[in-house]
């Protein structure tokens, strides 16, 4: 959760909690853009002639700053940066434009994501780096993003978006037949989705070819896609909805198809095991890498949220899944019948919290329900509100110079739901000095398998993660049939 900042308040209640539910259900696996990383060439799409990346402009500088702000800033690790630089140099030399220059920024985020700006600025999150098991897997991601730059996909997509916007305005101006208008708008959206998919397929073909010519194992792409799919499955199993069901306009094929296409594409260049994986060097480079959330921005441990920098903590009831985002901490209860949002706002010191709750930032607040309360010594106020599908309980709590909001929603308000909401708010307290000093990030630790070790025994050493055996398999690229043997090197997560 970001530190306090002025922000425009959401006025639509359903929109507020639709966003909260979406963020919580996606969690780690879908915060990484599964659709963006494809690895197969697609028949029927003519390749775009590679071009030089666009020059740096004030707009791209602003975009770079926005990306850093959204992803926790940059992550500095000289050893890891050296490995990435060496990898990119090999890829550039093997690309269609070896004269171009790329700069890679490691983002301080546990999300699994990678993307590129037209200028050749590439971004990878440390969450993606932690998930990859060798240099060839990372190279497949970097080559894919380089391909987007070479093919000038961002500029082409912008042109397509402008055309789609014109169509949308024309349809809206016609306005005579609602059914026809809806159909036309849907077709426009599907056309855009199909166009994005075409770009992804083109980047797949270019990227796998670059990796193969750089002598990396081109099958690293399919292995990494499999790891992403398994990560998403872990997330879906603990969240209230399957992330893939949340976007019906997604044009990307199911992950098994992506993996199959990646394998078919790689076979054009190499047989399995022929290219370089560079696993040992990669594991050495990521040893001690921060895993998951950065404590400086707050972090989730089970049902607790702790923010050592701001000095507070709270805990949600059993059955809630918490997710810390850049804007707020959001949570959803199993089954999706209850949701919550926790964030920070600026409220003038002279304005009472009760007046703030009734100031119009949320619609349909029952003013008669407003009451002043004290929570663990902190002045607070609470009220109820109602929407079409949700019933709300809201709190404002003054902590130092800032005001924190708890916004709870239930599809059906019951004494039990109201009690669980109150329990959450009443758990808000200051962290002790000892708790602040003990708040350390989780880290990737590389260990050597000893005689007698098993996947289960190694996974039992994992700390701070759910489903440790499954998480261990995903982190190390293992499936249900995999085993370990002495002297193997594997990743575990430790505190």
Set out the residue ranges of the language-model regions.
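A Zn2+-metalloprotease active-site environment signal
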Residues: 2-4, 12-18, 28-314, 321, ...
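Surface-exposed aromatic
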Residues: 104, 112, 122-123, 244, ...
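Surface-exposed amphipathic alpha-helical segments
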Residues: 139, 322, 406-443
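Residue-level marker of beta-strand positions
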Residues: 313, 319-321, 454, 489
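Signature of long, low-cysteine stretches enriched in small and polar/charged residues
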Residues: 341, 357-405
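Primarily a LysM-type cell-wall glycan-binding module
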Residues: 433-466, 488
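Extracellular LysM carbohydrate-binding repeats and other cell-envelope/extracellular binding modules
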Residues: 468-495
């Amino acid at each position: 959760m970001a530190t306090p900042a002025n922000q425009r308040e959401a006025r639509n209640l359903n929109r507020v909690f639709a966003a909260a539910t979406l963020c919580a259900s996606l969690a780690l696996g879908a915060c990484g853009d599964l659709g963006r990383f494809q690895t197969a060439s697609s028949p029927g799409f003519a390749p775009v002639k590679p071009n030089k990346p666009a020059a740096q402009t004030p707009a791209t500088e602003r975009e770079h700053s926005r990306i850093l702000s959204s992803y926790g800033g940059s992550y500095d690790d000289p050893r890891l940066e050296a490995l990435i630089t060496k990898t990119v140099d090999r890829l550039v030399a093997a690309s269609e434009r070896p004269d171009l220059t790329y700069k890679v920024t490691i983002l301080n985020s546990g999300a699994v994501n990678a993307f590129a700006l037209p200028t050749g600025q590439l971004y990878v999150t440390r969450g993606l780096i932690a998930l990859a098991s060798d240099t060839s897997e990372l190279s497949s991601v970097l080559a894919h993003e380089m391909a987007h730059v070479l093919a000038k996909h961002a500029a082409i997509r912008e042109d397509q978006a402008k055309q789609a916007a014109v169509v949308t305005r024309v349809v809206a101006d016609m306005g005579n037949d609602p059914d026809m208008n809806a159909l036309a708008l849907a077709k426009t959206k599907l056309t855009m989705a199909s166009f994005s998919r075409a770009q992804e397929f083109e980047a797949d073909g270019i990227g796998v070819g670059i990796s193969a010519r750089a002598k990396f194992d081109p099958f690293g792409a399919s292995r990494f896609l499999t790891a992403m799919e398994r990560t998403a499955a872990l997330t879906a199993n603990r969240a209230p909805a399957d992330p893939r069901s949340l976007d019906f306009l997604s044009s990307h094929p199911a992950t098994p198809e992506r993996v199959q296409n990646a394998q078919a594409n790689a076979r054009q260049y190499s047989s399995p095991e022929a290219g370089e994986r560079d696993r040992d060097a990669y594991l050495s480079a990521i040893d001690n890498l921060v895993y998951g959330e950065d404590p400086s921005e707050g972090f989730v441990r089970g049902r607790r949220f702790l923010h050592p920098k701001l000095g507070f903590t709270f805990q949600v009831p059993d059955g809630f899944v918490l997710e810390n985002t850049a804007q707020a901490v959001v949570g959803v209860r199993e089954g999706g019948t209850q949701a919550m949002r926790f964030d920070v706002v600026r409220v003038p010191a002279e304005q009472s919290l009760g007046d703030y709750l009734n100031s119009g930032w949320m619609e349909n607040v029952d003013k008669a329900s407003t009451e002043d309360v004290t929570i663990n010594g902190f002045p607070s106020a609470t009220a109820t509100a109602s929407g079409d599908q949700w019933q709300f309980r809201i709190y404002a709590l003054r902590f130092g110079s800032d005001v924190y909001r708890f916004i709870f929603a239930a599809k059906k308000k019951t004494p039990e739901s109201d009690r669980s909401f109150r329990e959450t708010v009443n758990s808000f307290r200051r962290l002790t000095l000892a708790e602040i000093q003990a708040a350390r990030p989780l880290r990737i630790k590389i260990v050597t398998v000893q005689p007698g070790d098993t996947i289960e025994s190694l996974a039992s050493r994992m700390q701070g993660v759910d489903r440790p055996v499954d998480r261990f398999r995903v982190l190390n690229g293992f499936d249900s049939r995999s085993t370990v043997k002495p002297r193997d090197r594997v990743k575990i997560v430790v505190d």
